[in-house]
Amino acid sequence: MRFKGLDLNLLVALDALMTERKLTAAARSINLSQPAMSAAISRLRDYFRDDLFIMQRRELVPTPRAEALAPAVREALLHIQLSVIAWDPINPAESDRRFRIILSDFMALVFFDKIILRLAREAPGVSFELLPLDDDPEELLRRGDVDFLILPDLFMSGAHPKARLFEERLVCVGCPTNEQLQGQLSLEQYMSMGHVAAKFGRGLKPSVEQWLLMQHGLKRRIELVVPGFNLIPPLLSGTNRIATIPLRLVKHYERTIPLRIIEHPLPLVSFTEAVQWPALHNTDPGNIWMREIMIQEALRIGI
């Protein structure tokens, strides 16, 4: 199909090349042969009068022109997919849809497990791909590469719709044998003790408790950094280290790991866990159904 002289199939090829950055992988992703993909690149270059991609160290590096085209091309393809091709009222009992969701290990453990159990009964064909926190989740939402982002809402952009899930509170926690945790913890004690902290993504972005502490201008003595909240409780056992983690996570682990909960010496505000989805998916029936399930389950655990 052509539109003003452009074969619209070439836009699919351009999007694949921008995503994969390798000729063979891009061709495979849209079921083209390598020669056919090479021909598509040639035709794209002729139409846009630009090289679009330059080979460097066996990788296709996009030119500024290709970088400028990419967002509009991806948005157009997503709009066609969601509004024309894929739009269909969902039948949960028969659906085989897969949802890609970015969330922390903490939320997977204390919240999303309930979604999985519920849908095993109500929509057994639905599956999930749970992804770790990314350095640029907003870009993944914009590209439609993920269906949902579950995070504290203070980390979410205003570019996409979102909904509140529940309030969470931070507490200080340590091993019961830690003699410094026998009474109320002063700010001086808190700052002088060794801490275990979680950071996320390749760029090791701070977690919510570190972000909140930074708002008070405080920097802890972090002795151990781990790639997620769920590793923290086991690593406190037998040590004098402490951590600041969500209360629901402590409640989950205290059944199997001895932990002592101490009120935080700072009036740290509770934070809101929220779910966000791509703006282009806002009217997608499957997306609407899935986020309603999440909001219903969040209401149950938020009581």
Swiss-Prot record:
Keyword Cell division among UniProt keywords: no
A Pfam family the protein falls into: HTH_1
Keyword Protein transport appears in the UniProt entry: no
PROSITE patterns reported for this sequence: HTH_LYSR
Every HTH lysR-type domain range: 6-63
MF-aspect GO terms: DNA binding; DNA-binding transcription factor activity
This protein's UniProt keywords: Activator, DNA-binding, Nodulation, Plasmid, Repressor, Transcription, Transcription regulation
InterPro entries from the UniProt entry: LysR-type_TF (IPR050389), LysR_subst-bd (IPR005119), NodD_PBP2 (IPR037416), Tscrpt_reg_HTH_LysR (IPR000847), WH-like_DNA-bd_sf (IPR036388), WH_DNA-bd_sf (IPR036390)
Residue ranges of the annotated DNA-binding region, renumbered to this chain: 23-42
PANTHER family: HTH-TYPE TRANSCRIPTIONAL REGULATOR LEUO, HTH-TYPE TRANSCRIPTIONAL REGULATOR LEUO-RELATED
Function, as annotated: NodD regulates the expression of the nodABCFE genes which encode other nodulation proteins. NodD is also a negative regulator of its own expression. Binds flavonoids as inducers.
Membership in a protein family: Belongs to the LysR transcriptional regulatory family.
Protein name: Nodulation protein D
Gene source species: Rhizobium leguminosarum bv. viciae
